[in-house]
Amino acid sequence: MAALLMPRRNKGMRTRLGCLSHKSDSCSDFTAILPDKPNRALKRLSTEEATRWADSFDVLLSHKYGVAAFRAFLKTEFSEENLEFWLACEEFKKTRSTAKLVSKAHRIFEEFVDVQAPREVNIDFQTREATRKNLQEPSLTCFDQAQGKVHSLMEKDSYPRFLRSKMYLDLLSQSQRRLS
């Protein structure tokens, strides 16, 4: 009944959200939950590239399609805030303007680090407070400790699940079929 009430233009969103309503391993075509542009790009993904993502977490993070695939996986687990925080920190480190540095630092803290932040990442009290203290004089390294903790958490927890997921295994299978 609800599907009848939704306008036709939202069909793509229903497909993406439908995938999210299942457990992450039950969603065989994760490209359905990616935006159109990465979806087209993933069709050009080579088996070699996708296989290299299993070499290390940093290899995955250095590949834009790897990040897109990992983000799609994390969305199915409702834990994409960790990756979004890590990416925001990487972008923050490229900031050259002092005025922008201060405003971006506060925005990232309020979005991801502060207690009850809208997309709060799971870090310990000491790291949160050290990061809060770093905001008194923001620098390009003020989030390094928190970013490192989040990186370790994803590397030890989410990344191994991603590599075992039906989503990733299907991606490898799809890229191998394109070679045949």
From Swiss-Prot:
Top-rank taxon: Eukaryota
GO molecular function: GTPase activator activity; GTPase activity
SUPFAM superfamilies, per database record: Regulator of G-protein signaling, RGS (SSF48097)
Entry keyword annotation includes NADP: no
Annotated TM spans: none
Bilayer topology: Peripheral membrane protein
Gene3D superfamilies linked: 1.10.196.10, Regulator of G-protein Signalling 4, domain 2
Chain positions found as Phosphoserine: 26
One Pfam family it belongs to: RGS
Residue ranges occupied by any RGS domain in the UniProt entry: 56-171
Alphabetic keyword roster: Cell membrane, Cell projection, GTPase activation, Membrane, Nucleus, Phosphoprotein, Signal transduction inhibitor
GO CC annotation: cytoplasmic side of plasma membrane; dendrite; neuronal cell body membrane; nucleus; perikaryon; plasma membrane; synapse
Compartment list: Cell membrane; Membrane; Perikaryon; Cell projection, Dendrite
SMART domains recorded: RGS
Predominant cellular place of this UniProt entry's protein: membrane
BP GO annotations: G protein-coupled acetylcholine receptor signaling pathway; G protein-coupled receptor signaling pathway; negative regulation of signal transduction; positive regulation of GTPase activity; regulation of dopamine receptor signaling pathway
InterPro entries in alphabetical order: RGS, RGS_RGS8, RGS_sf, RGS_subdom1/3, RGS_subdomain_2
Subunit structure: Interacts with GNAO1. Interacts with GNAI3.
Its biological purpose: Regulates G protein-coupled receptor signaling cascades, including signaling via muscarinic acetylcholine receptor CHRM2 and dopamine receptor DRD2. Inhibits signal transduction by increasing the GTPase activity of G protein alpha subunits, thereby driving them into their inactive GDP-bound form. Modulates the activity of potassium channels that are activated in response to DRD2 and CHRM2 signaling.
Name of the protein described by the UniProt record: Regulator of G-protein signaling 8
Organism: Homo sapiens (Human)
Biological classification of the source: Eukaryota, Metazoa, Chordata, Craniata, Vertebrata
